[in-house]
Regions:
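Conserved structural scaffold segments of CAZyme catalytic domains across common CAZy folds
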Residues: 1-97
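Aromatic- and carboxylate-enriched substrate-binding clefts and catalytic-loop regions
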Residues: 66-171
Length: 171
């Protein structure tokens, strides 16, 4: 067991990584409120509880799931502005003090609308966000293949890890 995953086949069959410095890419376990209960509560005390859980377990990450930026998949959705009940600077400070980094959930159409991701990714880097989880791509045509690559390239510039949730099979 483990022979395939530990082999050099992926590196051998693919071009070299286009990202020169990959030290910031650190996989790890993540606390996540929706994972536990199927319920998402965008409340400061609940988010802090999951940050505390991640810290107690030695997990490096906590994901703030859907609704963190209010209405999603709507023209008025703004992936740079947290919902009014969330104090993002406080969340990030609290997490950092406990050795936990934050991931943020995003709806794909909100990311794509007017290339919102370009400004948002720079902001997330400034905030100290570790990564983003993009959801509901719901297609696998060439447009989407190219979109994934644009997102990855922009995220890498801002040292953001990316989880494409429900993604098409990789090429």
């Amino acid at each position: 067991p483990g022979q395939f995953i530990e082999s050099e086949i992926i590196r051998t069959l693919n071009p070299p990584c286009a990202i020169e410095d990959t030290e910031w890419i650190k996989p790890g376990l993540c606390a996540w409120d929706h994972w536990w209960s199927g319920e998402v509560k965008m409340e400061m005390d609940v988010i802090k509880e999951y940050i505390d859980l991640a810290s107690a377990q030695g997990w490096p990450y906590m994901l703030i799931d859907w609704q963190w930026y209010g209405p999603y998949n709507e023209a008025k959705a703004d992936i740079t502005k947290p919902a009014p009940q969330l104090d993002m600077p406080e969340i990030l400070r609290y997490a950092k003090e406990r050795g936990v980094r934050i991931w943020l959930w995003l709806y794909s159409s909100d990311v794509n609308r007017n290339d919102a991701y370009k400004e948002a990714f720079r902001l997330y880097q400034k905030w100290g966000v570790a990564g983003i989880k993009i959801d509901f791509m719901d297609r696998q045509d060439q447009y989407m293949v190219n979109w994934y690559r644009r997102i990855i390239e922009e995220a890498a510039k801002c040292q953001l890890m990316v989880n494409f949730h429900g993604a098409y099979k990789p090429d």
